[in-house]
């Protein structure tokens, strides 16, 4: 078994490669993450990887006595009297994994737990229950084969597993986002929000519009879209420009880190085994509560501060006037504009609700109507199917609105997939890096935390993600790295609360310390006309406040409503 010092050193090398590669050598995040995954896998002994794989497949030991033990086999009919299991442990001196005993199934107790007879293997170092785990012979064979793969195959396996979970979703989200922008649907949503709340309450419309648009559209793109509208509002009202900027940021940035199918929260949910529908609901509630705190902060701040509307390189004030005066007839209807955003949310969350309602209910007690509804959501509530339907609707809307030919449509889709492809590469590379971190046995670093409070576990996840964000800038990369550190720990212990809270703590941690190493910092500053000092002075404290408040909400919810 690797010592804690050795594990820390290997993990530290990986983190240094990611942070140093991105900041020091200006490597693309994809290259930095893949390189880090390769180096960490090279430094991790095969025996450590094998032990990690065995740990994922171990059978819970409920009790043990001299010569016997009781196992939790979940009363599976596949287990028969006479079936053999293995007791394995890592030898302290060498780190190698050895089989120290066999366990033969001899019967079941009154609670249908398996009783096994223990027979030590001659010549082994002996059974030590606090260091040994029980596995099937097949699991031992599979773990050995997995650990003996080449480094290239190990990294590619982590990369491919991540692509399987989220690759299609990100590509479809990119298509939806591009169609919303090119068709004018995104602008229509913002104008509709403004018409509901009125120009006096324009900041609120910016919050909710930014939040809604940032689920299928990446934050930088949402800011590009909405800041001209914010500038146009400043031309109309003659005041509150700083408030407009900050409200555009707060809605978009919280959805960016908390609500799938945005890549960061989508990846975190997949790694922690959180249902996407649950993540959408929980992320939406926490994200909007954080945005409201950011709004209160901005209202107070803007009583004492404002900034002038300045010319910016990408758009003159005359062009702003043209945007402000654009006719509504040039834009799609509001229901068509909202459909690609709302439909997948309804389908995915509907599937989650049905699964929760019918969980544990015997089939004979479910009415035919409920069975039909359940089958509908099983098919159309699948995250990939729901997003594919939404992408189809978005494409149809773009074609109808622009009346473009197939070549123009192909160009739009090509641009969307090019953008989404880069995100898929970065996220999948992050998945490979995360898997390599987990295989070092990093969960052992948190051994003393297993019995710690809910608050302590969530704070650790938040702090780890925050420090990575501070070091390298990207919220998405910090979430990928943070969940890579925490996922194996979360899988190995009883958290005492639903893992969605761990995902939320990681997402909130990615909101801390916005500064000059983040591309979003420069997008906000340059597009709005703010100086670097103004961005640091006004925007950075707000995003950090929202992240910290999100952690507080998550801690309170996990303690009061653990959902387990």
Predicted features and spans:
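Core transmembrane alpha-helical segments of multi-pass membrane transporters/permeases
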Residues: 74-77, 82-89, 133-187, 211, ...
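Intrinsically disordered, low-complexity non-transmembrane regions of multi-pass membrane transporters
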Residues: 1, 49-146, 303-335, 360-373, ...
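Alpha-helical transmembrane segments of multi-pass membrane proteins
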Residues: 199-215, 237-257, 277-284, 288, ...
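Membrane-core helix-loop-helix motifs of multi-pass transport proteins
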Residues: 231-345, 520-557
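Long, contiguous bundles of hydrophobic transmembrane helices that form the permeation core
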Residues: 2-8, 57, 67-69, 281-411, ...
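Membrane-interfacial loop-to-helix junctions in multi-pass transporters
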Residues: 5-9, 160-167, 193-207, 236-244, ...
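Hydrophobic mid-bilayer segments of alpha-helices in multi-pass membrane transport proteins
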Residues: 8-19, 26-48, 128-136, 167-174, ...
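Hydrophobic alpha-helical transmembrane segments of multi-pass integral membrane proteins
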Residues: 167-173, 196-229, 424-432, 453-489, ...
